[in-house]
């Protein structure tokens, strides 16, 4: 396998401490329940991913590595490839070239969208999708990972463990005092937290979050940063965001995309002072 370098020569920061690792096993295979090899501490690995739409190269030999438990921010101008990258990871878009591995052996490019979600990857889009006529508690109940059909889960009594799990997630997303409130009456920020809670009910290992604080108040944005920091470690988070103050509050590694590949990586201060980033992204 080629060395993990993007076309600009930027080595994904997530690999710096694993010099002997040459990437995932070449015999990547379809997911089987309970199987996720994190022996090299990398949960997501994109290897030379390229995607073209009608001659436009949305991704150009993109290489990216995300550590297990990491909180990573992805920034870049419009058209940099951020959404296409998320689409490839979740199976919505098939790459023309390259591989996308979940852990050491699971090749996401060979899986369907439902299989990828079941494997432990959750995605949140910018606009929240919730059941507005049901309470916050009921929304989490519906999202719980159960071997039941949706209509049945509405009427089946929760076990004590299931009730406790819903209650724990409500506290985690700071909606425990809004448990019986119809979701449609929640504020915009609270709706975003509720959808994140619905993802958490699925027990994902990796969360993909697309502009999660768009439209939030300053207070909601601050609380969201605190939530994400608290989730890191148990979960891995990839956050696509334009709000630099929010990115700064998260305090993690930042990857800058440009024209479908990695332009720079580092903490926010480092990438903000990178001359290439200044020229193509910050406009200075």
Identify the residue ranges that each predicted region occupies:
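Conserved ABC nucleotide-binding domain
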Residues: 109-110, 169-190
């Amino acid at each position: 396998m080629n060395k993990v370098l993007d076309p600009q020569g930027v080595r994904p920061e997530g690999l710096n401490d694993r010099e002997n690792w040459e990437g995932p096993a070449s015999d990547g295979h379809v997911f089987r329940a309970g199987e996720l090899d994190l022996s090299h501490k990398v949960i997501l690995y994109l290897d030379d991913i390229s995607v073209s739409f009608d001659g436009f190269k949305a991704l150009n030999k993109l290489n990216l590595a995300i550590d297990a438990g990491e909180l990573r921010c992805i920034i870049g101008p419009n058209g940099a490839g951020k959404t296409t990258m998320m689409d490839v990871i979740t199976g919505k878009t098939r790459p023309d070239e390259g591989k996308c591995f979940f852990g050491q052996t699971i090749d996401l490019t060979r899986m369907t969208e439902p299989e990828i979600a079941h494997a432990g990857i959750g995605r949140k889009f910018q606009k929240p999708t919730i059941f507005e006529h049901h309470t916050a508690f009921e929304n989490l109940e519906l999202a719980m990972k159960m071997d039941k059909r949706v209509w049945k889960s509405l009427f089946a009594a929760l076990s004590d463990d299931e009730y406790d799990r819903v209650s724990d997630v409500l506290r985690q997303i700071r909606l425990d005092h809004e448990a019986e409130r119809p979701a449609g009456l929640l504020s915009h920020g609270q709706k975003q937290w509720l959808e994140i809670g619905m993802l958490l009910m699925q027990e994902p290992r990796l969360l993909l979050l697309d502009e999660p604080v768009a439209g939030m108040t300053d207070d909601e944005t601050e609380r969201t940063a605190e939530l994400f920091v608290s989730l890191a470690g148990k979960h891995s988070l990839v956050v696509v965001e334009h709000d630099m103050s929010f990115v700064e509050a998260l305090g993690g590694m930042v990857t800058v995309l440009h024209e479908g590949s990695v332009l720079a990586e580092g903490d926010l201060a480092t990438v903000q002072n990178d001359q290439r980033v200044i020229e193509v992204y910050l406009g200075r």
